[in-house]
Amino acid sequence: MRLSPVLLAALVLYAVPLAAQRFSLVVPASALATQVTGRAFLFIARTDKPEPRLQGGAQRRSEPFFGADVESLASGASIVIDGNTPGFPLASLARLPAGEYFVQGLLLPYTRFARADGHTVWAHMDQWEGQRFNDAPGSLVSAVQKIRVDANTNVSLQLATVLPPVQRPADTEWVQRFTIRSKLVSAFWNHDMPLGAVVLLPKGYAANSTRRYPVVYTVGHFSQRAPFGFTFEGCTTPETPEARAVRLARSAREPGCEFQQAWTSGKTPEFIAVFIQHPTPFYDDSYVLNSANNGPYGDAITRELIPEIDRRYRTIASSHARVLTGGSTGGWDVLALQIHYPDVFGGAWSLYPDQVDFRNYQFGNIYTDSNAFVMHDRSWLPREIPSSRTPEGMTELTMREENQAEATIASKGRSGGQWDGWQAAWAPVGADGYPKPLWDKRTGAIDRSVAESMRAKGYDLRDHLERNWKTVGPKLVGKLHTAVGDMDNYFLNLGVYRLETFLESTKEPGKGPYYAGSFAYGRPLKPHGWQPWSNQELLRIMAAQVARNAPRQ
């Protein structure tokens, strides 16, 4: 195609990087009582709806944002964001084309933790928002300004507004919420650390004062919503046939209103349903096991939170009457709880779980690969490793891009992003007290000693099962159930295939006992989020298992 001189000149002008822009984020005395250590951000967007700060993050549609550490910042001081400040999806502010934009500044404060392991670290103490770096209570933000950015831009943004605390929903006759101070995790962090629960009560719970109920524990990314999406909100508008067809093509999971109507009318088996809340200073989910960086969350959940639920509610306090389900992060969590605490739970239904075999750490093999960003199996044609894809197979984000985003959000593995979350949960502690990097976020070079430490600690669930099946296997018969789509957006089906291969091998002579669980695969083109049953159907499956495993009178 031939370009006219005018069009060619316009394209050249648009592509000229801007090298001299400077943004100053200023903290007025009225907004800051003490010095603060944390992370400062500049957000730039083409629209102000929503606010620019809510348009930046580790996702493929992110608007440009830039981040810098601040230490002992005093009121009245300025934080400079310029062409040397790292960013995403633009690596530098200097690469931003000239034009009109909406801009906003933010300062995320960190908390100092003098941990029991002797390390002192700074990280964001979750405020029950779920480690949302751009929307955390206590953060200082500026007003949104519309400006023209060019080579001479020099803008000052006043960080004069403090984001308010999270408003926790009120209890109802159906849904209750509570938190406890975990003695175990608080001792590790030398700081008060909460565990929480959102409890959904069955129909007739208040009227049947002597009846006890089995418990289904749901686990996953931090939320204040009720288990299984139970809600009364928006239920006056029925699902259209077209919307239902689209939903069922993706997953059998029903809308929250439909589940609520079945639950409140007594059409589901009678369980107490509990969603577990366990954010850490590194991620919105602890990954439910004891961790060198996060602390003893596995013991805290099983020895503190579950006994508290048994104390507060009329549960059947027996392992056969405790079942688990969750998807994605929660899918990994429920398998990990069932496998590592087999005497506490009576079955896990894992949906599209995070990597259950680290030979597919999403896509790559952290035990044998040298780089997390690039495949070098063709020396003259190195290829970028995808991190996410469409159900049709088109790459959405690469590993390099996602890690660039996390490195923009925070240094030292504190981004609250997915890769940093896994690293905090499973990696050893580094010499500086922060999680030891599994790979270099700039180059992608893998540290295999970290990978081997993760394997040795039992976080590679398939490997842990294979090494310990003779002792743990008898306690897991009939208790492991996994479902995933064949085109999971994050390649999580690959690890599930490997897990099934091992578990099915337990039927071979000398390898038993046979695991006697199940695997289900969504085909064709089923994405992340696919499940083969509605939540109502899943509860019926769980109720049948609870009844089968109940002690005989």
Listing of model-derived features with the role each one plays in the protein:
Residues 1-7:
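Bacterial N-terminal signal peptides that target proteins for export
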Residues 15-17:
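N-terminal signal peptide c-region/cleavage motif recognized by signal peptidases
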Residues 21-27, 33-41, 192-198:
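Contiguous beta-strand segments within globular domains
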